[in-house]
Amino acid sequence: MSRLQRYAGESLGPRPHIVVLGSCKVGNFVVSTPVLRGLRHRFPDAVIGFLGSDVTADFEQALPEVDWRASWDATGANAALLLQQFLFERRQRHGEVDLAVNLDGFNPVTCTLVPWLSPRFVAGGSLRSNLRGPLPWGANPRQSFLADSDWDSRSFLDRYDGLFTSNYIAELFCHLAFVSDYVDFRQIMLPSVLPPFEVPDLLIHCTTARAAKIWPFDRWAKVVRTVANWGWRVGLVGSPPSAQKEAYNSGEGEEWLLASTPLQDFRGRTSLIELAGACRKARAVVSVDAGPLHIAAAVGTPTFAVVGNDINGVGASPIRLWLPRVSSCSRSESTYTCDRCSLERFRNDDCLVDGHPCMKGVEPEQIIAWLKSINGLQKDSHL
């Protein structure tokens, strides 16, 4: 049988060898985990490998669904050669790859790695076996939807009426891998480890790689001061300060916030799996649209997403596609409606309107009112 066939849900036979390719972005990884559970439920005797990232390696190593893992973004002079050798050894030990599922299918690295695996079936992005061009999506809508340029709109659901029940990326991934009948895509499960410090009552995360999603720091200050007056301890989480400035648009905002409020600084003090533990232990987490939002929602902590989207979901973030679907997650509603980001398919880094009105349309009182509503919870009542 020829290799690199488009997957259409076929049986894979006894003890299949399946490889899932994931993203280096935290949010992408988190929403990939239902696929892993679905594959394990559908193919209980499978050997499941995961080609992921050094960024999320601690999560990947702790997932019970994963039998082996490697990082496609490892650095070093011989990293590519070592990865090739490792993948060859996995195929020697577990047999040829029956199915490759690329959940980072627009990444040229993962699309190149799929032919290296020489799988019988492919779900998601891949180059052809000769590496000279992309493997066609095929006619099955569970694969061909990847060619659609607009996953966040209501019209997307109209185009795939009867297939998808929502725009949520975890659901799309589960359909892509033909496991939507084997797992609840809304339920995200992440392992966690407690961090080496006393976790404050409230954790906040203020920054993101897209500046269009940044909430003004003076609004954060009002939230922190208000909650501190209740007697709550508030902690700031994120990457180390230098990375926050270089990659996540913090500018001097976080330093100002730390200097002018009772906020405690925990940036750079956790691994991702320890961040999950901190979120699990906290009373609540408030975050802009970024990786910590997805982690907090996944571990079941009351989580509030600060997004510049109006009551109908129009705004700075593709929330139809990305907002967690768990009951513990709530979001802000901006009083300003702007579709400029959606018209750009959210590819713009900065706000396209003077004054950033969508994010300024989120008042601190929304977050404060939400925090008041959970103020009666005990610290560990949701564990």
What annotation goes with each model-predicted range?
Residues 1-383:
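Catalytic machinery of carbohydrate-active enzymes
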